A protein has these predicted regions:
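Hydrophobic pocket/interface hotspot
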Residues: 17-27, 50, 67, 77, ...
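Short, highly charged C-terminal tails/helix-capping segments
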Residues: 35-38, 135-166
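Short, surface-exposed coil-to-beta transition loops
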Residues: 3-5, 60-64, 85-90
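Hydrophobic ligand-binding cavity/cleft-lining segments
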Residues: 1-46, 159-166
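Short beta-strand segments that buttress and anchor functional surface loops
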Residues: 49-56, 75-82
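Beta-strand elements of well-folded, non-transmembrane domains
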Residues: 10-12, 54-58, 71, 95-97, ...
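Beta-strand/loop substructures that line and gate deep hydrophobic ligand-binding cavities in soluble
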Residues: 79-132, 149-150
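A short, structured loop/turn motif at beta-sheet edges
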Residues: 11-15, 43-46, 68-73, 92-102
Length: 166
């Protein structure tokens, strides 16, 4: 297994960033990742199936992923079919100041067959790809291109103070 870990700060609140990382309709519509072809296969409450095609090291890699948001707010993308079967991406989040979020990615890809022979090169390619996709997400979020769906927004009741003397 080849594993890479990376991360970075995004200047948006954690709830917005977490929502962004599971909103594949937005990613497809806005072409957040130009080098990545995404297709939504199915969406059910708590789980999505995504087809992802990318070119890496001169090869076209196609995978089917199951995406779940975990109870702690992190996201787990598990490869259930394709080139990287058995691989995964875990995306974690923590607040980093008032309106910022630190995002960390852990990418795991099985290194069997030809991948075992090029594992060091694969690791470099995975790290570059992970950093690039994180930078694309950061640009999209910090440019104000993303707003969570209203169904995902928690609205606090408006508290008013009576101006009448009692």
């Amino acid at each position: 297994m080849v594993t890479v870990i990376t991360g970075g700060r995004i200047e948006r609140p954690i709830s917005v960033v977490q929502s962004h990382f599971v909103d594949f309709e937005h990613h497809v519509r806005q072409k957040v990742h130009p080098g990545l072809a995404l297709r939504i296969l199915s969406q059910e409450r708590g789980e999505q199936r995504i087809e992802q095609t990318v070119k890496m090291l001169g090869l076209t890699l196609k995978d089917e992923l199951v995406v779940r948001q975990l109870p702690d707010g992190s996201v787990l993308e598990t490869v259930v079919a394709g080139t990287n079967l058995g691989g995964s991406i875990h995306i974690g989040f923590r607040e980093d100041g008032t309106n910022a979020t630190f995002v960390y990615l852990t990418v795991r890809v099985p290194a069997e067959g030809w991948k075992a022979r090029v594992a060091p090169l694969l690791k470099v390619g995975l790290l570059l790809a992970a950093n690039q996709t994180l930078a694309e997400d950061r640009r999209d979020l910090e440019a104000g291109n993303y707003y969570p769906k209203m169904s995902e927004v928690t609205v606090e009741p408006l508290r008013t103070r009576s101006t009448l003397a009692t």
